[in-house]
Amino acid sequence: MGLGVSAEQPAGGAEGFHLHGVQENSPAQQAGLEPYFDFIITIGHSRLNKENDTLKALLKANVEKPVKLEVFNMKTMRVREVEVVPSNMWGGQGLLGASVRFCSFRRASEQVWHVLDVEPSSPAALAGLRPYTDYVVGSDQILQESEDFFTLIESHEGKPLKLMVYNSKSDSCREVTVTPNAAWGGEGSLGCGIGYGYLHRIPTQPPSYHKKPPGTPPPSALPLGAPPPDALPPGPTPEDSPSLETGSRQSDYMEALLQAPGSSMEDPLPGPGSPSHSAPDPDGLPHFMETPLQPPPPVQRVMDPGFLDVSGISLLDNSNASVWPSLPSSTELTTTAVSTSGPEDICSSSSSHERGGEATWSGSEFEVSFLDSPGAQAQADHLPQLTLPDSLTSAASPEDGLSAELLEAQAEEEPASTEGLDTGTEAEGLDSQAQISTTE
């Protein structure tokens, strides 16, 4: 006796003998028949698709003999084979010890009354009805319509009433005795809400819903203090352990590799042979190795083509004052170049102190800027000397250290330059006189 192989929905119609109740220690209970959900559709090789005495006759013909039944379950929507031994010696009434009624599967699934809110101290609460998980599926009388249940409650006012109740949480049926009482102190005779219709039917479940996996011992068989079979191994909690930064593989999932900003995202994830791949430790648990993040690429600077190209000139490094730029030997600052630069260049030279400490010398061919730093002051002796005329000396700022040195240098060289100009003028005068005499 027991359960057999499950199959799809039965052929030959959607009717059968519906089990309303199964008594304790009866042949039906020993065979594993489930009240309300099971329909007997075949006995032996006879399909029970009509309401007649075929089931009763075949049970009497096989008293104390095993007989095979095909049973359709509305909860799993499957057909299974059951072996039962009809008997008169089990101590109860009937050969099976179960009450049956011929009806269709669809109609039986609709005859469900869902227990909703249960008020405290109400007749429903005293009877042990559980809100939202209990379903009334039958009683001592046949219930065929939605109003039949409410009529049954009214007819049993102040009298005990037996109800067959299914609980979706425990996946089992039980018998509940309730005594309707309209004077209990609240609304209704039961003190609970009742739902009926499509939204209040018992949800279907897969065939393996209430079956435990093989090899799992019952809770009582586990030793004291032992973790359950599906418990996680001991280790750091997700809050205490750092997140994995590698593209490691474990069973059937892949963890993405974190990329630094600007790095290529087309790099393949590390394979099983890479250092970051998870490898099992001696205990059989995966071990993850962390890979540090790659630094971001250097920042690229783009020069504007409109600026001066100083690629051929070594500029001063503030961190190293011993290196000083060497100007090309062909570059010379003359009095003529400075005098022809105009007042704008002189103004920019005099206002260099106000622009962050830059001193700028402007000429007709180039323009060089020097930063105001200790290294620049230490190499002031190597700067080219400028000679300015008397009319331009007043424009220099005495507060600028470089301008003061230039003014002193100009004061020392001014007599020599003046004598040179006078000598040149006399020479030109003699040449012109010689030319005039020759012409005459």
UniProtKB/Swiss-Prot annotation:
Lipidation (N-myristoyl glycine): G2
Molecular function terms, GO-annotated: metal ion binding
Keyword vocabulary terms for this entry: Golgi apparatus, Lipoprotein, Membrane, Metal-binding, Myristate, Phosphoprotein, Protein transport, Repeat, Transport, Zinc
Localization (cell): Golgi apparatus, cis-Golgi network membrane; Endoplasmic reticulum-Golgi intermediate compartment membrane
Topology in the lipid bilayer: Peripheral membrane protein
Intrachain disulfide bonds: none
Region span, GRASP: 15-215
PTM notes: Phosphorylated by CDC2/B1 and PLK kinases during mitosis. Phosphorylation cycle correlates with the cisternal stacking cycle. Phosphorylation of the homodimer prevents the association of dimers into higher-order oligomers, leading to cisternal unstacking.
Essential for interaction with GOLGA2/GM130: annotated segments: 190-202
Biological processes per GO annotation: establishment of protein localization to plasma membrane; Golgi organization; Golgi ribbon formation; negative regulation of dendrite morphogenesis; protein N-linked glycosylation; protein transport
Modified residue annotations for Phosphothreonine: T216
InterPro entries referenced in this protein's UniProt entry, alphabetically: GRASP55_65, GRASP_PDZ, PDZ_sf
PDZ GRASP-type domain location: 15-105, 111-199
Superkingdom of origin organism: Eukaryota
Primary subcellular site in the record, as a coarse category: Golgi
Pro residues bias (residue ranges): 214-239
Residues binding Zn(2+), per UniProt: H18, H20, C103
GO annotations of cellular component type: cis-Golgi network; endoplasmic reticulum-Golgi intermediate compartment membrane; Golgi apparatus; Golgi membrane
Bias-annotated ranges (Low complexity): 327-336
Phosphoserine: residues bearing it: S362, S364, S373
Region called Disordered, residue ranges: 205-248, 261-301, 327-440
Pfam families: GRASP55_65
Assembly behavior: Homodimer. Forms higher-order oligomers under interphase but not mitotic conditions. Dimers of the protein on one membrane might be able to interact with dimers on another and so stack cisternae. Interacts with the C-terminus of GOLGA2/GM130 under both mitotic and non-mitotic conditions. The interaction is critical for the correct targeting of both proteins to the cis-Golgi. Interacts with TMED2 and TMED3.
Family: Belongs to the GORASP family.
Function text: Key structural protein of the Golgi apparatus. The membrane cisternae of the Golgi apparatus adhere to each other to form stacks, which are aligned side by side to form the Golgi ribbon. Acting in concert with GORASP2/GRASP55, is required for the formation and maintenance of the Golgi ribbon, and may be dispensable for the formation of stacks. However, other studies suggest that GORASP1 plays an important role in assembly and membrane stacking of the cisternae, and in the reassembly of Golgi stacks after breakdown during mitosis.
Protein name from the UniProt record: Golgi reassembly-stacking protein 1
Organism of this sequence: Homo sapiens
Name of the gene this protein is made from: GORASP1
